[in-house]
């Protein structure tokens, strides 16, 4: 439309009801300005504007398991047996899903197998 003659421009403007040539310079009105004000973020784990990586913005990383302040049950100290247990502590073997594997013996007639 910018290369149309004056007669065609006026005909188009009259048919559309408004000036189409005035709009050509400002056709991108929804473009944001180059200088933006800094965002107003609420105070929290991601309120910093720089040095704000994704892994540190995740609020789940700041949660910790609950700390036990007081318990009605007596906790055992690790490495010491309970005082009330009358059974002697025996050394326990590791639990395996099958019986132990038998060691194969090499045949004496063919020593290289």
UniProtKB/Swiss-Prot annotation:
GO cellular component terms given for this protein: mitochondrial inner membrane; respiratory chain complex I
Record protein name field: NADH dehydrogenase [ubiquinone] 1 alpha subcomplex subunit 7
Biological source species: Gorilla gorilla gorilla (Western lowland gorilla)
Topology in membrane: Peripheral membrane protein
UniProt subcellular location: Mitochondrion inner membrane
Top-level lineage group: Eukaryota
GO biological process, one term: mitochondrial electron transport, NADH to ubiquinone
Pfam families to which the protein is assigned, alphabetical: CI-B14_5a
Keywords: Acetylation, Electron transport, Membrane, Mitochondrion, Mitochondrion inner membrane, Phosphoprotein, Respiratory chain, Transport
Residues recorded with modification Phosphothreonine: 96
Family, as annotated: Belongs to the complex I NDUFA7 subunit family.
N6-acetyllysine carried by residues: 40
N-acetylalanine PTM sites in chain numbering: 2
Subunit structure: Complex I is composed of 45 different subunits.
Spans annotated as Disordered: 31-51, 86-113
